[in-house]
């Protein structure tokens, strides 16, 4: 079943994937060759479109049972020990939301997305793209902010300003744009603006994938239009602490 999540892209809420591509041979999925392909994918050097698509397919299917088990293990650990996840779960519950392991699920996703939220189905964590426990914490907190916003503000995702606002808040409050993460990606330059630049970038990418958005430029314009009010709204947190 196809559903629309936070970015407006389609993720698949089942283990069946619309991908007829054949998985690469075993020697390309391990050791030096896998490391080489991973590095090539990250840098884009010497990588054509077909090789890019093949790597994404191989990454999705590589060690799937172990990835799903790890995702469930990380999720359950966060339920018990993550301050941000526990805090957001409590506030979603106060608003009448009912989220638990029954509707916060780990599964395969079609496309390079970490997760998604759907008002009726809950939260999806993309086990085939989650690298470690701490990435899952950021993703789950992000989606819990969307769940909170849906209940608190009655977000209408067909309204681009609504979509932009919840994306700004989710990226700002989840920890995914923390300074150390951005330094690893982009170096020390423009240190003071890294956090806000990351939030703007992520929000615009998500809005640009909304079917009602006509272009990247429109997405950026909408993000800018709601930026001040949405970036400074840290509810239910007192401030951005991650």
Curated annotation (Swiss-Prot):
Subcellular location per the Swiss-Prot or TrEMBL entry: Mitochondrion inner membrane
GO CC annotation: mitochondrial inner membrane
Location (main, coarse): mitochondrion
Binding site for a divalent metal cation: 142, 146
Coiled-coil regions, chain positions: none
Matches recorded under Pfam families: Peptidase_M76
MF terms (GO), sorted A to Z: metal ion binding; metalloendopeptidase activity
InterPro entries: Peptidase_M76_ATP23
E.C. designation(s): 3.4.24.-
Enzyme class: hydrolase
Superkingdom of origin organism: Eukaryota
PROSITE patterns reported for this sequence: ZINC_PROTEASE
Bilayer topology annotation: Peripheral membrane protein
GO biological process: mitochondrial protein processing; mitochondrial proton-transporting ATP synthase complex assembly
Residue numbers annotated as active site: 143
Annotated keywords: Hydrolase, Membrane, Metal-binding, Metalloprotease, Mitochondrion, Mitochondrion inner membrane, Protease
Function recorded in the entry: Has a dual role in the assembly of mitochondrial ATPase. Acts as a protease that removes N-terminal residues of mitochondrial ATPase CF(0) subunit 6 at the intermembrane space side. Also involved in the correct assembly of the membrane-embedded ATPase CF(0) particle, probably mediating association of subunit 6 with the subunit 9 ring.
Family membership noted in the UniProt record: Belongs to the peptidase M76 family.
Name of this chain's protein: Mitochondrial inner membrane protease ATP23
